[in-house]
Amino acid sequence: TGAWFVVDDVAEITEEKFRKHIHAMFKLTNGQLFVFSDIRRFGELRFIKQIADHKPLTLMAPEPFDEDACDYFLAQCKKQKYENKAIKEVIMDGQVISGCGNIYATESLFATKIRPTKKVKSISKAKKIELFKAIVDVLKESIENGGSTISDYRSVNGGAGSMQDRLKMYSRKVCPEC
């Protein structure tokens, strides 16, 4: 979570809420500031020499866009620790798929007509593959639209995304198709 800004002066961060929650600031060789702000305080900043030095990073699933990511996803779904869990909980786990949070999990499940509470073991392999492809499609669409600016999200350039205008199910209490 959080937002990164590259600015000449903190005053250039136009939204007060981001200026109030600055947790790290670095002066770059060109004189600009590299600023980390995290309103929700979920993010963390660690200095490590290599990924192997930080175990949580070694456990992360491959990027969904990687060639072997679907096979990895299917293998994770077969694991006993996941088979009795709700599919939404599983696809939001960074050890199963990287980068699929609540918004994009909701949209992907809606696109494939899978109930979020459905147990992983009760979903066919073909349907899991369809779901994985939907996750990739939703993530690509989100990237193309600058992400979802729902509360405090901003792009690396500080701008708002527009994916929130394209969401079909997220934040609705009732399914529009059921």
Positions of predicted regions on the chain:
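Phosphate/anion-contacting hairpin/loop surfaces
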Residues: T1-G99, Y104-A111
